[in-house]
Design a protein with these regions (language model features):
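Gly/Pro-rich hinge or "lid" segments in bacterial periplasmic/extracellular proteins
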Residues: 81-139, 145-147
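Extracellular/periplasmic solute-recognition and catalytic clefts
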Residues: 113-120, 139-198
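Surface-exposed binding/hinge segments that line
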Residues: 15, 57-98
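N-terminal lobe/hinge region of extracytoplasmic solute-binding protein
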Residues: 1-18, 26, 49, 61, ...
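Aromatic- and charge-enriched surface segment that lines or borders ligand/interaction sites
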Residues: 12-56, 198-201
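Short, hydrophobic/aromatic-enriched beta-strand segments in well-ordered soluble domains
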Residues: 25-29, 72-82, 121-125
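A structural "hinge/loop" feature
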Residues: 1, 7-12, 37, 83-94, ...
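Alpha-helical secondary-structure segments
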Residues: 40-47, 72-75, 135-137, 155, ...
Length: 201
């Protein structure tokens, strides 16, 4: 949330021991993947183990001693106490066995669909949330580079373009363009070493 406190999404609740070295996560009921199969603790465990070996997420598991499932729950044991460990688990969960697919099976609000009209995101009728989705269908366009994306946006062939302040998409602002900030899972830290020159003075 706005205070960077973790919010339960796929788990209904979690518990930890007194010294915060062991966590038990209980999954939310009624959550299914895009193929209709139910989310299980085994799916979560498989995803986290794959994340543990990945370049992107491996650092988050540096303090993890072991992970296992028990009676439909996920148990994570740590090497050292960490009261903020749940905040590290904002990792997309996919169905075990589908992680190597071009489009792995997830539990999100939209389904990736390819039909006669091309690729699109279509509302997931079995999504577990009661949030009203803004669109039933979102058409997708594949582009080879940021210049092409900028051109398609400027010519109104594309109506939504995601860009960050460091991107090379250029200044796309105009009287007919609306800029909207949106939350991401990215956090940027700026650190200063005050123990060495020139900042040690």
């Amino acid at each position: 949330n706005e205070s960077f406190a973790p919010q339960n999404v796929l788990c209904s609740r979690y518990e930890h021991n007194d010294d915060c070295t062991s966590y038990t996560f209980y999954l939310r009921d009624g959550v299914s993947f895009s193929d209709g199969s139910s989310l299980t603790a085994s799916d979560v465990l498989a995803t986290l183990r794959r994340a543990q070996e990945s370049e992107r997420y491996s650092a988050r598991f540096a303090n993890v001693a072991s992970m296992r499932t028990s009676n439909g729950a996920l148990i994570v044991n740590l090497m050292r106490a960490d009261s903020a460990f749940p905040a590290l688990l904002d990792i997309p969960i996919v169905k075990s066995g589908s992680e190597k697919n071009t489009v792995p099976l997830g539990t999100g609000p939209y389904l990736f669909v390819t039909d006669s009209d091309g690729a699109c995101l279509k509302q997931n009728p079995d999504w577990h949330s009661d949030v009203t989705l803004p669109f039933e269908r979102i058409e997708l366009r594949a582009v080879k580079d940021t210049d092409t994306a900028s051109y398609l946006f400027s010519s109104r062939e594309v109506h939504l373009l995601s860009a960050d302040l460091t991107s090379s998409t250029g200044d796309l602002r105009s009287a007919d363009t609306a800029l909207t900030d949106y939350a991401t899972a990215n956090m940027i830290y700026l650190g200063f070493n005050t123990q060495r020159a020139p900042l040690s003075d």
